[in-house]
């Protein structure tokens, strides 16, 4: 099996013989795939766990064969190989979304969370709180994976761009919340601190900010009205010019008709 379509992420991987390494651990160790758990082959071999996926993945059987290290029956062209590898990516991601909701999958992700392998919250007052991957939808192709902070209860883009290609459906909308229910000791007990805007040491009153917002909205409204009036004036001027041109054309036509009439009278 050709495995050159992605680079490995560590010197240790470079030292391993890829021909002797199973596809699943090899795939999960690729740079950019650190969020993925290593799915047990027993889980994948159970057809019940894959129900409904065959209609979602092109070349399903061949892609499943790649994941389970089954050699293809016939030699593949480079284009065929790339298409199958892409299908294997998608299939593994869809299986992964189901696996991490199982007790064994949750336990695996629990260990990764404790090691902060998914990153930490970028918010200052969350004090480097580890985050969890989450999808904004359970349907593939809607959005990329985000990270959820259990301290501030907000979501962010992953820190590293190499994770920006991962589909959010490969983790789903349920996973982080199910993990925290399963392992309640992971829920931060300290409430998140909120930033308080101040000017010269004094807290900005909410009404002052609302007043500034109202003023800005009025300015925007006046600006839009002025722009609309200008556009209307331009349109009116254009219409007047068109009317003047039409009148001039009519006058010219009338003059031409008069000239023609005079010529006819002269000829008679």
Curated annotation (Swiss-Prot):
<dbReference type="InterPro" id="IPR035991">
    <property type="entry name" value="Casein_kinase_II_beta-like"/>
</dbReference>
<dbReference type="GO" id="GO:0005956">
    <property type="term" value="C:protein kinase CK2 complex"/>
</dbReference>
<dbReference type="GO" id="GO:0005634">
    <property type="term" value="C:nucleus"/>
</dbReference>
<comment type="similarity">
    <text>Belongs to the casein kinase 2 subunit beta family.</text>
</comment>
<comment type="function">
    <text>Regulatory subunit of casein kinase II/CK2. As part of the kinase complex regulates the basal catalytic activity of the alpha subunit a constitutively active serine/threonine-protein kinase that phosphorylates a large number of substrates containing acidic residues C-terminal to the phosphorylated serine or threonine.</text>
</comment>
<comment type="subunit">
    <text>Casein kinase II/CK2 is a tetramer composed of two alpha subunit and two beta subunits.</text>
</comment>
<dbReference type="GO" id="GO:0019887">
    <property type="term" value="F:protein kinase regulator activity"/>
</dbReference>
<dbReference type="Pfam" id="PF01214">
    <property type="entry name" value="CK_II_beta"/>
</dbReference>
<feature type="region of interest" description="Disordered">
    <location>
        <begin position="222"/>
        <end position="268"/>
    </location>
</feature>
<dbReference type="GO" id="GO:0005737">
    <property type="term" value="C:cytoplasm"/>
</dbReference>
<dbReference type="InterPro" id="IPR000704">
    <property type="entry name" value="Casein_kinase_II_reg-sub"/>
</dbReference>
<feature type="compositionally biased region" description="Low complexity">
    <location>
        <begin position="224"/>
        <end position="268"/>
    </location>
</feature>
<dbReference type="InterPro" id="IPR016149">
    <property type="entry name" value="Casein_kin_II_reg-sub_N"/>
</dbReference>
<protein>
    <recommendedName>
        <fullName>Casein kinase II subunit beta</fullName>
    </recommendedName>
</protein>
């Amino acid at each position: 099996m050709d495995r050159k379509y992605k680079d490995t992420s560590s010197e240790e991987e470079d030292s391993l013989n890829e021909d002797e390494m199973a596809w699943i651990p090899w795939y999960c160790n690729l740079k950019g795939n650190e969020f993925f758990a290593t799915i047990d082959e027993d889980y994948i071999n159970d057809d019940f766990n894959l129900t409904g996926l065959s209609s979602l993945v092109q070349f399903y059987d061949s892609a499943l064969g790649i994941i389970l290290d089954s050699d293809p029956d016939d030699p593949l062209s480079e284009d065929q190989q790339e298409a199958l590898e892409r299908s294997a990516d998608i299939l593994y991601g869809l299986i992964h979304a189901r696996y991490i909701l199982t007790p064994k999958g949750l336990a695996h992700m629990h260990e990764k969370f404790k090691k902060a392998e998914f990153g930490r919250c970028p918010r200052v007052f969350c004090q480097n709180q580890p985050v969890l991957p989450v999808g904004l939808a359970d349907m593939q192709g809607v959005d990329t994976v985000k990270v959820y902070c259990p301290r501030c209860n907000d979501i962010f883009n992953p820190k590293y761009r190499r994770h920006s290609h991962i589909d959010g459906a490969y983790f789903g909308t349920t996973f982080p919340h199910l993990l925290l229910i399963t392992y309640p000791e992971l829920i931060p007990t300290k409430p998140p601190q909120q930033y308080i805007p101040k000017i010269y040491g004094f807290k900005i009153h909410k009404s002052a900010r609302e007043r500034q917002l109202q003023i800005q909205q009025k300015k925007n409204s006046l600006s839009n009205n002025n722009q609309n009036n200008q556009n209307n004036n331009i349109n009116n001027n254009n219409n007047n010019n068109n009317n003047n041109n039409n009148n001039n054309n009519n006058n010219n036509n009338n003059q031409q008709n008069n000239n023609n009439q005079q010529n006819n009278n002269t000829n008679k």
